[in-house]
Amino acid sequence: MLIGQVSRLSAIPPLALQHTLRPLHSSSVLAAGGKRPKQSPSHSRNSPRQKPDWEKRGSNRGRSEQPRASRFGLKSSGTTSFRSEPPRARRVISDSSSGSSASITPKGQHVPTSSRRLLPFSSSDTIPKPSHRFKLEPATMPPNLTPRSFNRDDGVTEEYINGLPAYPTPPTTLANEEQARPRTFDDFGLEEGLVKSLKGLYGEDGKTTPIETLSFHHFTQPDIASAPIGSQRVLLGAETGSGKTVSYLIPLFHHLKRTDPGPSVTSSFFADSENTLHPRSIILSPTHELTRQSTQFAKILTHNTKLSVHGMSSTVSGGVGEKRGSVDVLLGTVGSLRRMFGMTRSEEEQEKEDYIRGKRIWQDEQEKGMVEGDKVEWVVIDEADVLLGREFYLDTISVLSQVKQANLILCTATLPPFLINLLTTNPFFTKKEPFIHLLSPGLHKLPPKLLTRFIRPSTTGNKHGDVAHQVRLTLAEDAKAAKAEGREGEEPSKIVIFCNSDKQVEQVSGILGTKKIDCLAWTGAGEERLRGRNGSLNDFLQRPHLPGHEPPAPLPSLEPRETKPIFQDKNGTTPNVSQVTRRRVLVTTSLLSRGLDFHPSVSSVFLVQPPRDVLDFVHRAGRAGRAGRPGRVVVFGIDEGGTLGEGAKNNKGGKGQGPLKKDGKTALGDRLKDVLGKREVVGAMGKRVRT
């Protein structure tokens, strides 16, 4: 057995099992349409105090109505009521090598929450420990209120290290290079059909990635194969573009095939098979786009094993379609599964996810429960830090509650402290064996061949103009490199631009249009987001296929039109670009930043606005440079020191070299430097300043 490959967390004390803990904060930046959840403006200091919220605990007040401060456990001193006001000044402890020093966080300045940062991987004796005891609230506490142990007036001192809360997080470790070394697909004793599919995709000499090695080795152990259903609880963590989807799909298919009851079990096996669907496994994803891509990839991997795969986001109705009886793998969003399990919402509680372009996804006859969880053996939660975060936690738990007993796999590219804490303190997850952690050595690192390019602002202050100029320069640079390397016949390079809101997407795409740069604007409520299919988005997504099975051609743009060349060489000609071209620039939000595998032609990712924190940065930047390919992330609004927002704006003269902020104003700071690889600073006109 591979020694040291996994780390088991200590069992929770029996007393803690008597209480309930909701997740503190969310690691989710995904709301409907890729928008961030709206928050009520903070009250002024002279505004009247609110009535105690303890009286409202039985109410069904929506999360969107909850004041920002109460979400984060901020309360005024001397009262038990939650109040929407900025936090008071707090002591911040610095663990610099020169010694510890204390500073005061200015009043009214929001300290980043502990869930919006990356888990530090240090030896257990150096992990910061809070000075206070971690207290769990009684089960009567409603899920929309924050545990009092993180309130400001509970009489407990809270420590901060480098401006971040010292979260009471159990330690965990990464696998080492030897444990995660590449191995051939034949080394693990996988089902023959799965090995054949893997070799068809990655070649006869193909080898595993680190997270695939860890996962395949663990799930093919003899004791795992014979373990009872419900005993397997695994957390898979690896950097973006490292094969996490394969790392959970292959073991899942391996065990489903080993326990396949055979062709004798048909739809007629179930008494109510004409009306319901009985999946053997469920895969949850945060978005319809990711669900569709995972469904397509799952069908490719099971081509030689003949397992049945059904994706709910691939149907026009958004449900199970005409599928009934038994199915091996069912993929869907949390909202889709809630519907199919019969957990409907009132009109006031209906999510925007239920609508696309103003039309309902669901057909009336599919609003009632059409899926039964009695036969589910495996549940996979993809992008677990999102689905177990604030915005999706209650819905995710409600779906899991419909499954009587199943093995559980969590998959994530970022591991915020709240997730580990949740899995080791929440009774929902501590009723059984502790989670086994399979963490890649490269977790919380950007892809090794991804170049980070910081763009200094121009003296004109026209950021959108700078973006358009950088788009032209980047595509020209890619065309020149392709010509030099003899790759002129390949698909032209593409760019994905991330914005923080739908409105910003509209603004950026409009400016690019005026600059004769045709682009695809993709938002939750966008005109090109279709029900049941990706449409023009397929131009930018990976299209895997087995030998002899060519991938479906991506759909052309809805309104193809002639476009002028967006760049020309010295002779005035446009290299490798036809007069009628597909769109090569995608402008979107965080809606597409989670889990999606973009086509190799996507060479660059642009971050037009500063990301909210390092988690956002890692996920957005990780859409390029995937699977060992070179790529670049072009960053606007952040200088090379990692300063965000106002810190970048305050740099006069377009220098972009302001001092690194360490006052807790943002969550990047030192953590940004930890995830970056190769980097360079470029002026607004494209001249390299330094590397």
UniProtKB/Swiss-Prot annotation:
Residues 94-103 have a biased composition (Low complexity). GO terms for biological process: ribosome biogenesis. ATP binds at A238, E239, T240, G241, S242, G243, K244, T245. Residues 50-68 have a biased composition (Basic and acidic residues). Keywords: ATP-binding, Helicase, Hydrolase, Mitochondrion, Nucleotide-binding, RNA-binding, Transit peptide. A motif (Q motif) lies at residues 183-213. A motif (DEAD box) lies at residues 382-385. Its EC number is 3.6.4.13. The keyword Protease does not apply. GO terms for cellular component: mitochondrion; nucleus. Residues 1-31 form a transit peptide. Signal peptide: none annotated. Residues 474-691 form the Helicase C-terminal domain. It is found in: Mitochondrion. Residues 225-433 form the Helicase ATP-binding domain. ATP-binding RNA helicase involved in mitochondrial RNA metabolism. Required for maintenance of mitochondrial DNA. PANTHER family: RNA HELICASE (PTHR24031). Belongs to the DEAD box helicase family. MRH4 subfamily. This is ATP-dependent RNA helicase MRH4, mitochondrial. It comes from Cryptococcus neoformans var. neoformans serotype D (strain JEC21 / ATCC MYA-565). The lineage of its organism: Eukaryota, Fungi, Dikarya, Basidiomycota, Agaricomycotina.
